[in-house]
Amino acid sequence: FTQRRMKLGFTQADVGLALGTLYGNVFSQTTICRFEALQLSFKNMCKLKPLLNKWLEEADSSTGSPTSIDKIAAQGRKRKKRTSIEVSVKGALESHFLKCPKPSAQEITNLADSLQLEKEVVRVWFCNNLQ
């Protein structure tokens, strides 16, 4: 299965997402990985094998022409582009961190507004700097 999947150019995450879209059962990348490594229970392997065989047949038969499987893979979870923080903004975050390394949600919101950053970016910055 693994070799055929890779030859077709699909990731484990693509397969899990496609199974959900095509057959109604979404499987995580971890589950597909464990299937390939034969690390699932016998019962779960038996449940997953027919779905994966069906998916492989459809993927094999559609090579060369864009299909629903290709479209599903294309709309897979997109990662957010890495955030780059300007030097002046980083300085402001660092000075606030020295005063208060664990700001409240309200403080994070206020700081994000004042620095014109997304609240999530500020929250993650503080989490990363605690480590």
From Swiss-Prot:
PROSITE patterns, per this entry? HOMEOBOX_2 (PS50071), POU_1 (PS00035), POU_2 (PS00465), POU_3 (PS51179)
Enumerate the subcellular locations listed in this protein's record, separating them with semicolons: Nucleus
Q: What is its main location?
A: nucleus
Annotated tissue distribution: Brain.
Alphabetically list the UniProt keywords. Developmental protein, DNA-binding, Homeobox, Neurogenesis, Nucleus, Transcription, Transcription regulation
The UniProt entry, under Gene3D superfamilies, shows:
Homeodomain-like (1.10.10.60), lambda repressor-like DNA-binding domains (1.10.260.40)
InterPro entries named in the record: HD, Homeodomain-like_sf, Lambda_DNA-bd_dom_sf, POU, POU_dom, POU_domain_TF
Annotated DNA-binding residue span(s): 78-131
Q: Name one GO cellular component term.
A: nucleus
Record Pfam families: Homeodomain, Pou
Q: Which GO terms of the molecular function aspect are on file?
A: DNA-binding transcription factor activity; protein homodimerization activity; sequence-specific DNA binding
Every copy of the POU-specific domain together lies at 1-60
* GO biological process, alphabetically ordered: metanephric ascending thin limb development; metanephric DCT cell differentiation; metanephric loop of Henle development; metanephric macula densa development; metanephric thick ascending limb development; negative regulation of apoptotic process; negative regulation of DNA-templated transcription; nervous system development
State whether it acts alone or in a complex, and with which partners, per the record.
Homodimer.
> Which PANTHER family does the annotation name?
POU DOMAIN, POU DOMAIN, CLASS 3, TRANSCRIPTION FACTOR 3
The record's family statement is: Belongs to the POU transcription factor family. Class-3 subfamily.
Summarize the protein's role.
Answer: Transcription factor that acts synergistically with SOX11 and SOX4. Plays a role in neuronal development. Is implicated in an enhancer activity at the embryonic met-mesencephalic junction; the enhancer element contains the octamer motif (5'-ATTTGCAT-3').
What is the protein name for this chain? POU domain, class 3, transcription factor 3
Q: Which organism is it from?
A: Sus scrofa
Q: Which gene encodes it?
A: POU3F3
